């Protein structure tokens, strides 16, 4: 079984939460293949998963909010980032759907926040 997790790259909380779920799955089903699709860094994911093997497909599924500083949001930059995401998402979804089909067998999609994950599952 392939587990494909679309994870928001906006902050480490999403990655930590998904890692906890997937680590619990791996403990019960160690032969399952774990794939993390996220813009989170490989270093962060390696730390979160430890010795549990996983694959990282570097995809950005959402923008969250672009920070102006530690406490503020840069609304214009967030809107620009969202427009760019909406422009490239159709190609990304098509490419990831094709990749998933090439893997053969069943796949379970998990999404932590990105609504576009539902389009990939369709």
Model-derived segments and their meaning:
Residues 1-11:
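Nucleotide-activated donor-dependent transferases that construct or modify glycoconjugates
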Residues 6-7, 36-40, 111:
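Short beta-strand/turn micro-motifs composed of small residues
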Residues 12-16, 44-45:
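Short N-terminal binding/cap micro-motifs at the start of the first secondary-structure element
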Residues 15-26:
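Short amphipathic alpha-helix
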Residues 26-27, 46:
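N-terminal cationic-hydrophobic initiation segments that often serve targeting/anchoring roles
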Residues 29-35, 104-108:
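Short active-site oxyanion
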Residues 32-89:
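Conserved nucleotide-sugar phosphate-binding/catalytic loop shared by glycosyltransferases and other
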Residues 95-122:
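Conserved nucleotide-sugar donor-interacting segment of glycosyltransferase catalytic cores
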């Amino acid at each position: 079984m392939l587990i494909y997790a679309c994870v928001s790259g906006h902050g480490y909380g999403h990655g930590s939460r998904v890692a906890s779920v997937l680590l619990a799955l791996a403990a019960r089903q160690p032969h399952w293949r774990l794939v993390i699709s996220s813009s989170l860094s490989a270093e962060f994911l390696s730390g979160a998963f430890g010795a549990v093997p996983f694959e990282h497909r570097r995809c950005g599924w959402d923008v969250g909010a672009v920070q102006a500083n530690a406490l503020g949001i840069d609304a214009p930059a967030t809107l620009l980032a969202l427009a760019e995401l909406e422009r490239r998402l159709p190609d990304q979804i098509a490419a990831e759907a094709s990749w998933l089909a090439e893997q053969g067998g069943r796949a379970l999609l998990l999404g932590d926040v990105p609504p576009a994950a539902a389009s990939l599952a369709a």
